[in-house]
Amino acid sequence: MYTIKEAAQQTGLTEYSLRFYTDRGLIPAVRRDENNRRLFGEEAMSQLLTVKCLRECGMSIEAIQRYMALGTDGKEALQARLEIVLEQQKTAEQQLQQAEERLGFIRRKVERYRTSIAEVTEE
């Protein structure tokens, strides 16, 4: 079992984030000791890493709550989890397209300035 400080160090998350995630019910496997301090076993640590990854992918807290509440037992739960992940994939693809458009704009600006500098230098 890991204390909140140890779990934060192991996952790279802040203690604040761990408290937030457990308070929002994202880590159902978290336990409490006799002093009501959070304790994280292997299952809770795995859940933390899952939540961390989903957040890094841009998934909302609400979507993660739905995802984690479904569990992994049964075809219906797996299908519902798949739908949540597919929706996130669609969002990520849209964001990637927007980023590529912005990058194209920047590249055109860079080329324009390089051309302008070369023209000024030649004069």
Describe the residue ranges of each PLM region.
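Minor-groove-contacting beta-hairpin "wing" of winged helix-turn-helix DNA-binding domains
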Residues: 35-41
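Glycine-centered, phosphate/nucleic-acid-interacting loop/turn motifs that mediate DNA/RNA or nucleotide
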Residues: 25
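Beta-hairpin "wing" of winged helix-turn-helix
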Residues: 28-35
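Short glycine/proline-centered loop/turn elements that form peptide/ligand docking sites
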Residues: 7, 14-17
